[in-house]
């Protein structure tokens, strides 16, 4: 966003970005990404073409910027998880779960964009996988697990995490606090 003299952002610019992005999210919730025309975004956001192109080179650029912004937020959540000590972990996880729930409509809409250049769902999967690998290193799991075992576990953890987000958020429900217990119960059932 454009800053005027290194002070706070121009409120008109902030409102314009917000209107365009909200319009795009609404359209994504109603139709497929490839079916959305710039004109539909303009009409929904109530901005003219020149204003749109002042900030975005096209629909793909809008998607890229929104996905990049969202990925920065998710990256911070994963970083906070990695840096949390055991005493703060529960509070941090509940806080982050709430933040993700508040952004669920945007997340679900952006997940619908699956192109060669834009795929937030896959990007979040990879971020979750990498976070698990970093946690394994931090907890010295690399001392007793092979790299292949850690890669497998990271892949499975990212898969179940993303599927859980999708499952609950599509039902308009927050992630339950007992989610790890649910996962453990699944393992218990398999072992029985």
Predicted segment positions?
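Hydrophobic alpha-helical connector segments
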Residues: 78-106
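Helix-turn-helix
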Residues: 27-61
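C-terminal peripheral helix-coil segments that are non-catalytic and often amphipathic
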Residues: 137, 158, 166, 170-192
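Generic hydrophobic, amphipathic alpha-helix propensity
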Residues: 12-24, 41, 66-70
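Short hydrophobic clusters on alpha-helical segments that form packing/core surfaces
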Residues: 16, 20-28, 100, 128
